[in-house]
Amino acid sequence: MIKITIVTCTFNAEHELQRTLDSVFKQSYADIEHLIIDGLSTDRSIEIAQAYKQHSDEAETGHEILVCSERDKGLYDAMNKGILKATGDYIVFLNAGDTFPLETTLEHIAHSIGDGEALPGVIYGDTNVVNDDGHLLHRRRLQPPEKLTWR
């Protein structure tokens, strides 16, 4: 089974974070590592993240959850911390306020990847931009890059 790491970067996002955590909690796919990387928030973000971890553990979702709160140098530093802590085969960035469109999103992704020896190096998809009520504002379609480099 393919392990998917979700990295959620957050900083003082108490009003946005819960919907992101709920979206991950509801995923039907079990082999999930969820890293919540917080930039030392001064609001209730840490409390919300820790309550989510406890709720997920009690519900026996199978999701591994790590909450890390320490000062960082902004979003990209937090993302890099998440990459370094990740143990999954693939990393998904789902920041505070972001959600998956379906409860089966990760299940569909894992199924489309398969368990073959030749796994794709990058997976990407379109982005739906929605308002606070969840109504679609527009869709951002991505083009595959012509060249990728890894450093």
Specify the residue positions occupied by each region the protein language model found.
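Nucleotide-sugar donor-binding/catalytic module of glycosyltransferases
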Residues: 1-151
